[in-house]
Amino acid sequence: MLLRNGKILSYLNLTLTAAIWGFAFVAQRSGLESLDPFTFNALRFALGTLCVWLVRKVARPGDAPARTDCGTTFTRKGIRQLLLLGLLLFCASSLQQTGMLWTSAGSAGFITGLYVVFVPLISLLRGRKLSKALLVSIPLAVMGLWLLNKDVGLNANLGNGLVLLGAVFWALHIQLIDRLTQLHSSLDIAVVQYAVCTLLSALVAFPVSRAVPAWNMDLAELLQGIGQATVPILYAGVLSVGVAFTLQLHAQKKTAPEVASVILCLEGVFAMLGGYLILGEEVSLMAATGAVLLLAAMLATILGEGRGHFLIDKKGKPKF
């Protein structure tokens, strides 16, 4: 079994995405100290939209759809799907960011990573068959996530419930990306979904900030809050949105969503690593064991995908 260079690059892109997202949980939690969830998301996705739009202006022709028979124009159906992708991104990011008001970054990281379960469940509903490698790696990943976050103190509270619902939307988002990256360039998809998420976040931020006294700020207070959250906004906007989400889009052109979800849940490992390197947090033996299991799940998935057991229907054709 020999993996092609394109596959290897996709795996590296997904791993880098997981690393950026892992460190982003701390940034997102810090941003909530100064801004409400929707204003924070509106600002970071606006920044991400701007970054990707600028890159798109100078992008090389290599940023093309995975399929060569679909052209470059947007159909009405394609536009509706892109708008739906932006809506899913808005729902997922809003639920996650709002949930973090009542839960820790560690809890949010663990619960969000449960999309590794939801993605293959959705695939089964779509009529796909999971390979033996995935049947092994998914339980490994769940066990690894649990061990990695065993000490965070999960409770059945509102915050964890919102983040869990967000994980379902993240799974739907990953699944729809699987289809759209076959039909459109990753930069086109990125600009549209980020812009939609920015607009929806801004539209919700205004009435919500007026309804919640703690978030009701005048212009001077808002500018002060933005100033205090500058670093989290820059990290979450430029790196988490502009770089990581776009890398995910590019990588999923050649990677099945089930495989992508296993690799992306490595964000929990990088969150732990960031806490150790930056915040000086201790890493328990249990957490280290969880990290090893997550790495094992990723390797099992990658080796299994090399056998070509994904994205094939009963007639042997690609299934979208």
Outline where the language-model segments fall:
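Glycine-/small-residue-enriched transmembrane alpha-helix faces in small-molecule transporters
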Residues: 1-42, 87, 91, 95, ...
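C-terminal-most transmembrane helix of multi-pass membrane proteins
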Residues: 3, 45-46, 53-54, 58, ...
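Hydrophobic alpha-helical transmembrane segments of multi-pass integral membrane proteins
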Residues: 8-13, 39-54, 58, 134-140, ...
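Loop-to-transmembrane-helix transition segments
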Residues: 9-17, 65-96, 158-166, 215-243, ...
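Helix-helix packing/entry segments at the starts of transmembrane helices
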Residues: 18, 43, 108-114, 177-199, ...
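Specific transmembrane alpha-helical segments of multi-pass solute transporters/efflux pumps
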Residues: 24-25, 53-112, 147, 237-255
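Specific alpha-helical transmembrane segments that line the substrate/conduction pathway
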Residues: 39-50, 97-128, 132, 166, ...
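Hydrophobic transmembrane alpha-helices of multi-pass small-molecule transport proteins
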Residues: 52, 130-150, 167-170, 201, ...
